[in-house]
Amino acid sequence: MPTQNSHDNGLLAAAEDNIKNLSRRNFLGYIGGASALLLTAAACKKSDTPSTSKGVDLGSKDTGILNYAYALEQIEAAFYTKVFESPYAGITAAESARLGDIRDHEISHREFFKNALGTSAIISLTLDFSTINFGTRDGVLSTAKAFEDLGVSAYNGAGHLLASADYLLLAGKIVSVEARHAAYIRDLIAPGSFADGLDMNGLEMSRTPIEVLAIAASYIKNKINASNLPTS
């Protein structure tokens, strides 16, 4: 784990001010402020700023994995925001409340990574949801299920690629929230179907960054360059 110097301490103070603007109830409440500040201090290094010469370069090492997570959180946050621009026909008050909570969680995740990465963060992606039917319950919930499952499998598949124990702890806490989202969406579609997200060994699905980005590419107009991400 990197040692903290005076520069890092300054970053911690600045990060605390930035993160106060995020939703503590929805995010910092379950990941812990101290870990969040450590993430900010270690990640905000100008030398790690991704290049855009060959598409949106996620970067390398832990910064690359954090940008990978940030890209996925951008998709999820934008999707749930779009859901509430014109809620599907027949949405109940209970569904609206719970989906609204998920939206707020995803926005908090997105803004957390953006603030934590600082100058190393990738750009805001241009997304394309034209293939999604936002007007029907089935269209929204089936897509929500797909996105939540993708997010869970992404965090599960990338955890071992992180060198920092602090980052790994954060990823584990975030994926637990994503898994709860996935379970709730499944229960909306078919009560009691939460186990559908497990593999034959009873474990949650896992995908590599390349596998995840191949699926996510359908909704991203930007070219994503993941060539510098760690693979082991």
Listing of model-derived features with the role each one plays in the protein:
Residues 2-18, 31-33, 46-232:
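All-alpha RGS (Regulator of G-protein Signaling) helical domain and cognate RGS-like helical scaffolds
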Residues 21-25:
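Twin-arginine (Tat) signal peptide motif
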Residues 26-45:
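N-terminal export signals
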